[in-house]
Amino acid sequence: MAAGQQIIFIDGDTFPHREWVADHMKSAGERHVLCGRRVKLGPRLSPSVTAQDIEAGKFDSAFSPMILKSMLAGDTQRLGLGVRVPRPIARVLHPRPRKLMGVNFSLPKSAFVAVNGYNEEWRVYGHEDRDLELRLIRAGYPRKALLNRAVVFHLHHPERERSEETMRLIQAAEESRDVRCDRGYDLEEAFDPLG
């Protein structure tokens, strides 16, 4: 169970900019769901990324030679989202809320608990964050964009197709009026996707 008052989420196929946690915490509020995005590193650059590169600061700037070369070769996408700008400028550039993406978001623990977190009945790949987002909206938790602030780099991998079951679950979530899921954060034992 999370001990802090703000919960920050990231995917296992990504790595954050060194200021990522600070960016989320500086923008945190009592009710806001903070929605970041990702720079999509390409299939040629991703296998060559090392922990040493990250620790050496080679991803501290979107304009580093390693990233620029990859972008100019058509390998890396959404590089503009990797440019960190001061908060007042980011708010002017991105005034409207963005969709919640599980790869990069944070929210008050109280909001997560209020909607009972992720729905553990959602046992198919992908888009479980859409269900969570809809319940947070229904519960009155506004979204706030963190584009050009909380930067995350996504390592390339083949994408999976949305299954019919996933599409059915998304449609059911969109048609529902539920704020809380039945099987979520309050479970004693969470769903283990590995079995």
Predicted region positions:
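Active-site-proximal specificity loops/subdomain of glycosyltransferases
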Residues: 1
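Short aromatic/hydrophobic "clamp" motif used to bind/position activated sugar donors
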Residues: 7
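The conserved acidic donor/metal-binding loop of glycosyltransferases
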Residues: 11-15
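Conserved donor NDP-sugar-binding/catalytic core segment of glycosyltransferases
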Residues: 19-69
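Short, flexible, basic/aromatic active-site loop/helix in glycosyltransferases
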Residues: 54-97
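A short, conserved alpha-helix in the catalytic core of glycosyltransferases
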Residues: 99-100, 104-116, 123-142, 147
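Terminal low-complexity segments of carbohydrate-biosynthetic enzymes
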Residues: 103, 138-142, 163-195
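Active-site donor/metal-binding and catalytic loop motifs
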Residues: 146-163
